[in-house]
């Protein structure tokens, strides 16, 4: 009876086709776990965010104290807040691993799925930035002032856009109110895009590590991969609990424990760690407009990846030179993240310029050239 119901009921049938009887390649590895982990962490972020919003006061005079009140007076408020703030870090760590897996195994050849994912990444970064502003601490205030002021670099309309976003001549109560509304709204838009992402994914099926035909050997998603996803969820929950309970302030900035003061500038303004790679690229270009364009290009360049795939082989599993270039790109990304957290002085300025240039050269020039070169080598007979 249950077997027939899940295949005939209009709603259960969708769940069955997506999570139970979904034909899945038999050889996908743990690297394919991050999709389900991202869905889980997104739901954790939405649920904890809704509970935090119940006690948040979007006013420049009471926002900081309302966050402190939530942590001190609300039943388990400290735990919910710790889950939300550290959950964002876990979320972005999984996102970067998910993107890295897509680059390594050429999942970007599903253009629709990949492009929706890149749009989700941009909206997630926008959502996280607005969320970072809400506590109205010292780093929140000055981070909002610096980043939003970058839009003034847009020719002709930049000086008009910035006061419109601020709701006045500077970052003020109207800015906080707008960011609160958008921070609450955007996760639900991201959730809709996630469903679109899954629809495109299930339309063509998942890639596999060997790059073989997707129809060669398939098994049902349940119970084989649901058990693997449950194990991944347990490990992810362990990481989140460790951060939330033992090291809740590890990934935060001490400056943000001080209420916002427009009359005192922090010695070093920097965003959260998951923005540091883009922040390093922004700082490495002395021209304001050039820096803004480079910062946004560091994200939207991912949209070009499918068009830069020149090799006839899909994954990098059998392409040792491409593997070397891939890990060079990963190390370059980590170097940019490290540089973005350092002060703007020597030698970090020069290092930032070198790593920023290498980031774009690797993606736009070296990877396509190496793919074309690999086409001239002898291909294994089963590719």
From Swiss-Prot:
An annotated Gene Ontology molecular function: ubiquinol-cytochrome-c reductase activity
Keywords: Electron transport, Heme, Iron, Membrane, Metal-binding, Mitochondrion, Mitochondrion inner membrane, Respiratory chain, Transmembrane, Transmembrane helix, Transport, Ubiquinone
GO CC list: mitochondrial inner membrane; respiratory chain complex III
Encoding gene per record: MT-CYB
PANTHER family: CYTOCHROME B
Membrane topology: Multi-pass membrane protein
Assembly information from the UniProt record: The cytochrome bc1 complex contains 3 respiratory subunits (MT-CYB, CYC1 and UQCRFS1), 2 core proteins (UQCRC1 and UQCRC2) and probably 6 low-molecular weight proteins.
Chain's role: Component of the ubiquinol-cytochrome c reductase complex (complex III or cytochrome b-c1 complex) that is part of the mitochondrial respiratory chain. The b-c1 complex mediates electron transfer from ubiquinol to cytochrome c. Contributes to the generation of a proton gradient across the mitochondrial membrane that is then used for ATP synthesis.
InterPro entries associated with the record: Cyt_b/b6_C (IPR005798), Cyt_b/b6_C_sf (IPR036150), Cyt_b/b6_N (IPR005797), Cytb/b6-like_sf (IPR027387), Cytochrome_b (IPR030689), Cytochrome_b_C_euk/bac (IPR048260), Cytochrome_b_N_euk/bac (IPR048259), Di-haem_cyt_TM (IPR016174)
Superkingdom classification of source: Eukaryota
Binding site for heme b b566: 98, 197
Binding, a ubiquinone: 202
Name this polypeptide is given: Cytochrome b
Signal sequence extent: none
More details: Heme 1 (or BL or b562) is low-potential and absorbs at about 562 nm, and heme 2 (or BH or b566) is high-potential and absorbs at about 566 nm.
Organism listed in the record: Caiman crocodilus
Coarse class of the protein's main subcellular location: mitochondrion
Cofactors required: heme b
Biological process per Gene Ontology, one example term: mitochondrial electron transport, ubiquinol to cytochrome c
Family note: Belongs to the cytochrome b family.
Compartments (UniProt record): Mitochondrion inner membrane
Residues annotated as binding heme b b562: 84, 183
Co-factor: note: Binds 2 heme b groups non-covalently.
Residues that span the membrane, as ranges: 34-54, 78-99, 114-134, 179-199, 227-247, 289-309, 321-341, 348-368
